[in-house]
């Protein structure tokens, strides 16, 4: 998602 982080699961 738009808030995806490289060190977190997609969408978080």
From Swiss-Prot:
In short, the EC number is: 3.4.21.-
MF terms in GO? serine-type peptidase activity
- Give yes or no: UniProt keyword Cell division: no
Gene Ontology BP annotations? proteolysis
Q: Which keywords annotate this record?
A: Hydrolase, Protease, Serine protease
Family of the protein in this entry: Belongs to the peptidase S8 family.
What this protein is reported to do is described as: Serine protease.
Q: What is this protein called?
A: Alkaline protease Cc3
Look up the domain of life of the source: Eukaryota
């Amino acid at each position: 998602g738009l808030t995806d982080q490289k060190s977190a699961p997609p969408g978080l």
